[in-house]
Regions:
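N-terminal, charge-rich interaction modules
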Residues: 1-56, 60-66, 70-71, 169, ...
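Internal, well-folded beta-alpha domain core
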Residues: 54-55, 62-186, 193-196
Length: 196
């Protein structure tokens, strides 16, 4: 009789990585749509799916433990050169990611931002490719500077960065083509809104 994989090993199974890859593709195809990953631990599952020994990875805030580094076998580098960057969304950005080049805009970094919660909190209105009219995404634990910097980083489209927001078990993608506007009806004094 086959026993189910433990939570720790689930992310490293080929079948789970295929499932997560499809969920990531759906998330990028329909920006702001929240996808729940079976088995939880969205960060581990996303990294196990996207990163391998050919990828460059930065973890400037040391969110990953040593065993994850060893399993991924990714080439660790500074955030400014990395294809994938793991960061705490509640902290302001402390680096300038790679934006790609006009010849190879796909070399722009993908930011994996760990947030407190998707589905409640600050409301963002999204428009752009993959969104029929507007899509609303609510998020808790995303520092406003990420959205401010995102606007600057993506200003020279097709250069820019893509973002994957994740809480414990869910993901939502913000491709560089998506326009994000904070819902000002919920803004409090001193809040800002972003169009990016």
């Amino acid at each position: 009789m086959n026993k189910p994989l433990s939570q720790d090993l689930l992310a490293w199974s080929a079948s789970q990585q295929q499932t997560v890859f499809r969920q990531l593709m759906r998330s990028f195809s329909y920006p702001g749509r929240v996808e729940t990953l079976a088995g939880g631990d969205a960060l581990t599952q996303t990294l196990a799916t996207l990163v391998d020994r050919e990828a460059t990875l930065a973890d400037p805030q040391n969110l990953m433990d040593t065993s994850m580094h060893q399993r991924l076998q990714a080439r660790m580098t500074a955030a400014e050169q990395a294809q994938f960057i793991v960061a705490n969304g509640s902290q302001p950005p402390s680096f300038e990611p790679c934006l790609g080049t006009l010849e190879s805009p796909e070399h722009g970094a993908t930011l994996l931002l760990v947030v407190t919660s998707l589905g409640k909190g600050t409301s963002l209105q999204l428009t752009g490719p993959g969104i029929a009219a507007t899509q609303r995404l609510t998020v808790t634990g995303l520092h406003s500077e990420w959205l401010t910097h995102r606007q600057v980083w993506n200003d020279g489209f097709p250069l820019g960065v893509d973002m994957i927001l994740m809480d414990a078990a869910r993901i939502a993608a913000l491709p560089r083509t998506t326009v994000v506007i904070r819902d000002t009806s919920e803004a409090t004094q001193g809040d800002t809104s972003w169009a990016m």
